[in-house]
Amino acid sequence: MSRKESRTQAFQTLFQLEMKNSDLTIEEAISFIKDDNPDLEFEFISWLVTGVKDHEVVLDEKIQPHLKDWTLARLLKSDRIILRMSTFEMLHSSTPQKVIINEAVELAKQFSDDDHYKFINGVLSNIE
């Protein structure tokens, strides 16, 4: 399956982990999707989910300066996860920033409120 579908599953896994207040391990959360989606890139999903969880503080420090008059705590959980996930990928992969931002916008259109994709696009476009 595509990277796009794998990013969607990584997003859903991170959302699930945040909803469960980390009672679930990353491996347990990923195992829930393995049975239903054997063709996904689980190595990529695991790398992305683990990277976001392990680097949350650093990612938040990178994102926060670009949230004009907002704090990460005030954002929707979905927006916060999309920003962290995309920032991690921009900092730690060779995938072009444009591709990562486009995927983030698509995730926001699917999982966030109506116009939040514009906000996601604006924040990520300013992260280096």
From Swiss-Prot:
Keyword line: RNA-binding, Transcription, Transcription antitermination, Transcription regulation
Family classification: Belongs to the NusB family.
Function comment: Involved in transcription antitermination. Required for transcription of ribosomal RNA (rRNA) genes. Binds specifically to the boxA antiterminator sequence of the ribosomal RNA (rrn) operons.
PANTHER family in UniProt: ANTITERMINATION NUSB DOMAIN-CONTAINING PROTEIN, N UTILIZATION SUBSTANCE PROTEIN B-RELATED
NCBIfam families reported in the protein's UniProt record: nusB (TIGR01951)
Gene designation: nusB
MF GO annotations: RNA binding
Assigned GO CC terms: cytosol
Top-level taxon: Bacteria
Pfam families given in the database record: NusB
Any GO BP annotation: DNA-templated transcription termination
Protein name (Swiss-Prot/TrEMBL): Transcription antitermination protein NusB
Lineage start: Bacteria, Bacillati, Bacillota, Bacilli, Bacillales
